[in-house]
Regions:
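Phosphate-binding loop that captures ATP/GTP phosphates
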Residues: 1-26, 141
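Phosphate-binding/switch loop-helix module in NTP-utilizing enzymes
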Residues: 27-70
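Conserved Switch II/interswitch segment of TRAFAC-class P-loop GTPases
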Residues: 77-96
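G-domain G4 guanine-recognition motif of GTPases
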Residues: 84-85, 111-123, 142-148, 165
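Conserved C-terminal guanine-recognition region of P-loop GTPase G domains, centered on the G4
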Residues: 91-110
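Beta-strand-loop-alpha "switch" segments that mediate conformational coupling across diverse proteins
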Residues: 118, 132-160, 173
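NTP-binding/hydrolysis catalytic cores, primarily Walker-type P-loop NTPases
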Residues: 157-204
């Protein structure tokens, strides 16, 4: 019965996923606007349970919204990486998330966070050091603004490593993947974009 249940979950998940590479499959959001998608807090529990039972690693790109299912997903996640841009609104939202998740996840280590699109020309920004002071924690990565690299990847439907395997951002993403999957000790990136993380995995 157990074997049949696992095979059933595998078949179910295989029908939902789109294979992108040997080690990457995507579960995409609906592409049509014919109906409204208002999800309840437990709407994705079945899918998440099936993914956890059949996949070695599940990464969820949770949308920038706060409702029942996003709250439930974050609280039950093994690890959380908050992605923020260096402005006041993102600092406020990240601070609120940090404060809530530290309380809601007492037995788990605190969320990680990274800064994205840093260094946009002529845009006032909050410095990474000021971000770190407000959140009482260092970012695990700081990604510089690079419209050509990220624009090419987005328009071609490619990952950063596929566009430029030797780019410093590709190395940063590799180190982030190692951190979040716990597969190896994270080292400081050559470009200096990834902060030292020795001992951070066990930090509460």
């Amino acid at each position: 019965a157990t074997v049949g249940l696992v095979l059933g979950k595998l078949f179910f998940i295989d029908r939902l996923l789109s294979k992108c590479a040997d080690h990457l499959s995507l579960l995409a959001a609906p592409a049509t606007l014919e109906r409204a998608y208002d999800f309840g807090a437990e709407a994705f529990d079945g899918i998440f349970d099936a993914l956890r039972a059949t996949m070695p690693c599940v990464v969820l790109d949770v949308p920038h919204q706060w409702n029942g299912w996003t709250q439930r997903t974050l609280v039950s996640a093994d690890d959380i990486l908050i992605v923020a841009t260096p402005d006041l609104a993102n600092l406020r939202n990240a601070k609120n998330l940090f404060d809530y998740l530290r309380t809601a996840r007492l037995n788990d280590h605190r969320p990680f966070y990274m800064l994205n699109q840093v260094g946009v020309p002529k845009r006032p920004e909050i410095k990474p050091a000021d971000f770190a002071k407000a959140l009482e924690d260092e970012p695990v990565a700081v990604i510089p603004f690079d419209p050509q690299l990220f624009g090419s990847a987005a328009n071609n439907g490619q990952m950063i490593a596929e566009v430029s395997a030797n780019h410093r951002n590709a190395e940063t993403f590799l180190q982030l993947a190692k951190l979040l999957t716990g597969r190896s000790e994270v080292k400081k990136a050559k470009s200096g974009l990834l902060t030292p993380l020795l001992g951070k995995l066990m930090k509460k």
